[in-house]
Amino acid sequence: MDAELLELQRQLEAAQSARSSVRLSERNVVELVQKLQERGIIDFELLHTTSGKEYITSDHLKHEIKMEIKKRGRASLVDLSDILGVDLYHVERQSQKVVADDPSLMLINGEIMSQSYWDTVTEEINEKLQERSQIALAEIAAQLHIGSELVVNILEPRLGTIVKGRLEGGQLYTPAYVSRITAMVRGAARGITVPTNLPSVWNSLQLQLQEMHGASGVSVEGSFFQSIFNGLLKEGVVLGSVRAGVQWTPAVFAHAQKESVDAFFSQNSYIGYEVLQKLAIPQPKQYLEARYPDGIALEAVFVHPSVVDMLDAAVGDTIENGQWIDALSVLPSYITGPDATKILSLCPSLQKAIKSSKAVVFGESCVFSNAFIKGIFDRLEKEMDSFGIKHSAGQGKPSNMSSEHRIGSDGKDLGDNDTSSIGASSDKGPKKKRGKVSGSAKGAAVEKDDDNEESIPVKGKKAHRKNKDAGSSGDAKHGGKKASEKTKEDNTNIFPDDLIEQKVLTVAPELEELGGSDDLNGPLKLLSSHLRPMLMDAWMKKRNTMLSENAERRRRLLDNLQKQLDEAVLDMQLYEKSLDVFEDDPATSAILHKHLLRTMGAPVVDKILLTLHKDNKLKNGMDVEDSEENVQLSTADRTSLAKDLPGSLSVKAQALAETLEGKRFDSFMDALRDTAEESGLLFKKLDKRLERSMLHSYRKDLTAQVSSENDPISFLPKVVALLFLQAYNKALQAPGRAVGAVIALLKDKIPAPTYKVLADYHSTTVKVLALQAAATEDGEDCATDRMLERKEDLEERLMPELKSLVLGTSKE
């Protein structure tokens, strides 16, 4: 049997080793395989090798890929294509199927890796880790030619099993090293007693590690320290709090903070924010509000509610007693103005008083009861007349002045002229009689024009006085809007803050402690602003009352002025006509012009200015004393009064006052006419009929005075005036030094005997006056004797003779 088997083996071997006489070419084989595939005999996929001389099935390719991976653990698809001699495309397809069928395999970046491969790699990594205590993932990735993310994915499931270490911040650490770092972090955290920035702590630990191990020491990332610290904090190993992940505040420090804040606040009932900032509390206001919900957070400090209670009690007493209080005087010194304002806003008694109009707050901290303010107002109202308020001329709007020009009330009667002038009345006669010479010379003609005196002209500026008053209501309608817009400004002009403050300090000196008025929001300034409308209302009421009372007084005042002006204007026009006679004698003409300006013009101007000044005051609601005292004004007084008059009237009045210092009476009359028209007064013109009547009355009165005159000195100017009237039919007023020139002018106008006696009388009178001036008090003096002798001659010889001549001529 064995021999037969051996024989069969030899025959098989011979058959196998024998060469066929017929061989198939490669082309034939390819065609044969295609025929078999077409007929379905070969029903599976055949793959060509890269050489093209061999066929391989997909299953066989998969098998060879598995065997290669099993042998190597990690294989690149490119390497498998070269090793197996199969196109890379087919290798990729079959590799994907292999990986899909075997979960222990993975295909990453063109490489197939098995779990066994990673187990082997991680074992090697663990060995290196134990040797070095730390390995960087970047180093592992570089050695394995893979990405760091893949290294992490491979290592994480094997940490604690194959790899004995901890992965943190891209580093692998051994447990012993982690424990050592944990101890360092724990010690550092517990050693810190003040708020500290954690990165700076980690930097210090890194420097310490480098000093311990040198340049070759293990490098530890700050994130590793932070991770360990977070774990310790979570476990409660270290106590404290972390803000923003980097600012560490130890519990011991927070505890010390709370104790310090509580101690300060409980002892002082307040605490400043700067105290908390020194304690390293970053948001002091929020901290205190959370710590003490009942406390009050102010701008600079945090206070206990008891501070409000204390101030509320003080404010309540102040309001109840009708006084004022500065909250800063009650509150502790550490509370400033803005904080005092907020505390006041929290006082119930003050808020209740404000709602019921019992108190008001001025400035940041001053509380005034309305009773106190009313007390000040009442005293100021009583003293309002001492404020020195005057009214803007023509506008009816008052303004304050520091000093007011004060002159006596009414000027003297316009009919009272210089008694030394020709035609002047005797000082010894009664007032009514004295007025007849110059003031009443118009006689019956004035009586006939009584109706005209009561009328006011309506043309041009003559209607100014009444039309202005009548149009005030219309102006109020059209200008009401503008007036309302300017009310505040007008109030300020009437009662300036400085004036009110000065008066307030006068009646309430205790308010001086509030300081000056530089601060526009200061308590004293605000109090003055509060009082201003009250004072304005009181002033307006008083002014309106005074206006209604003054209306009748104004009418009487202006009517009286008009009557006196009518009389004076007619007299001045009458006397002005005599000036034409002396135009050829400039020296005498100048004397007569100045004499009329002084004796007749000045009293008229004084009366007009004083009356218009008084009328302006009455028109604006100011009180004026009624006085008939005659006052002679100086040039400065006239200018001052004229400037106080309103608008264009002031200009005209100043021009009128200036003409008194001039040399022409006609210029004065023109200025007087302009002023009268501007003020609404009537300026009567002297017509022929009135002139004849006045000259007739003047002649009659002057004749009576010459007839009854017994004083030889006073007799001369009267008789000269009478002779001048007889010669030229003109009324004359001349000073004593112009009598000689007048007598010389009469030489050719009167009879020679009369002229001779008149000239003799004049020369004797001049000598008497000269001797009288030279005489001494000694009655035996020779000059006195000669004076008495010549005066006796005047009385006994010349005066009777001259009377006879003049009166005889007058009667004729």
Curated annotation (Swiss-Prot):
Residues 389-495 are annotated as: Disordered. GO terms for molecular function: UFM1 ligase activity; UFM1 transferase activity. Keywords: Transferase, Ubl conjugation pathway. Its EC number is 2.3.2.-. InterPro entries: Ufl1 (IPR018611), Ufl1-like_C (IPR056761), Ufl1_dom (IPR056580), Ufl1_N (IPR056579). Belongs to the UFL1 family. This is E3 UFM1-protein ligase 1 homolog.
